[in-house]
Amino acid sequence: MGLLTYALQGNLGKFHRDLKVLSKKEGRSVFSLFTNFLYCFAKTGCGYSDYLNYKFYKRTKKELMEYVTIKHQEWFYEIASPSAYKTFFTVKPNFMKNFSQYVGREFFTEGTVEELEAFLERNPLIMIKPYDGLAGHGVAKMTREEAGSAQALYEKMQKEHLFIEGYVKQNAEINRLCSASVNTIRIMTFGYKGKSRILYAAMRIGNGVNHCDNFHQGGMGCSLDIETGKLYGIAIDKDLNEFEVHPSSGVKFDGFQLPYWEEAKKMVLDAALVNEHIHVVGWDVAFTDEGPILIEGNRRPGYDLVQVLSDCGRKDIMRSCLEDINAAEGTNYKL
């Protein structure tokens, strides 16, 4: 499935209901908003969620044209992260093996029932995940008791193409922010010709109810100062609700200092050079009491989190990568 198809496969009925709510808030008719969506789609290739999340109904044409949508991601990532090398990242067991020095936890992808039983004995709390997936779908936290017999779990893994990994015990300071989920930092890097740099970083925090911090699974995001490792401003969820403090813990976001930030930066800058063909990666970094670890690497990271938090389009991120590629390869890629 192409990303553009993915963007527009959403529920049109739900989009219409969302427009009805927005109509009252903005004082515009549903017809006016929908025709505006069609205009924005023609100009940018945006999907339903893009239109709402980025408040396209409020943007000038100049502002609109700076937003990265699914359309731009498809084009850009074929240059910066070609599909020919995707399984290095997208098949999650491959990722765990390829970046084993950075993941900091046990995982089980293949073996015998007896080996699975031994794994479960060593890991009384596990995460069960699909071999591939987007936006945190299909991820579940499970105790040893909930997992049932090793034989039954083994058969389920084989049938549904699942793998399991040991649950990450997160750093005490991060746990203070939200203990219901493992809260991660999304760091996008550009690795090219033996050099790497950080393009942006933001924190993702669970809502205190779900076991997942993903923006698409009820989590929220907060801007992060790359130099200091401090959060700044407010947190925002996908419904654009704003939070000065975490709704469950009451901890203030602005000024919250991440532990092991320098170590985290070094880790992702090193990891960015592991595969010389994949230049742009969105790393999900967790913190334990011993330091940072990689949860996963996304070969084609989305722009929704950074653009919602920035409240503006971020084509500048893509342009900075294309400038380096053009200079080195004599190409003339433009966005």
Q: What residue ranges belong to the model's regions?
A:
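Conserved N-proximal alpha/beta basic substrate-recognition cap immediately N-terminal to
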Residues: G2-R122, V268
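C-terminal active-site "lid" helix and adjoining low-complexity regulatory extension at the edge
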Residues: G13, E242-K266, L273-V280, F287-L335
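Active-site nucleotide/adenylate-binding loops and adjacent lid/helix of ATP-dependent enzymes
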Residues: W75-I185, K193-G194
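Short, surface-exposed beta-strand-loop junctions and turns on beta-sheet-rich folds
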Residues: L134, I205, R300-G302
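Short catalytic/ligand-binding loop motif for oxyanion handling, primarily in non-cytosolic enzymes
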Residues: A135-G138, V209-N210, D304
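Short acidic-glycine loop/turn motifs at beta-strand connectors
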Residues: R144, G191-K195, I226-T228, T288-E290
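A long amphipathic alpha-helix within ATP-dependent nucleotide-binding catalytic cores
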Residues: V168, A172-C178, R204-T288
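Beta-strand scaffold of nucleotide-dependent catalytic cores
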Residues: L177, N183-F190, S196-R204, C212-N214, ...
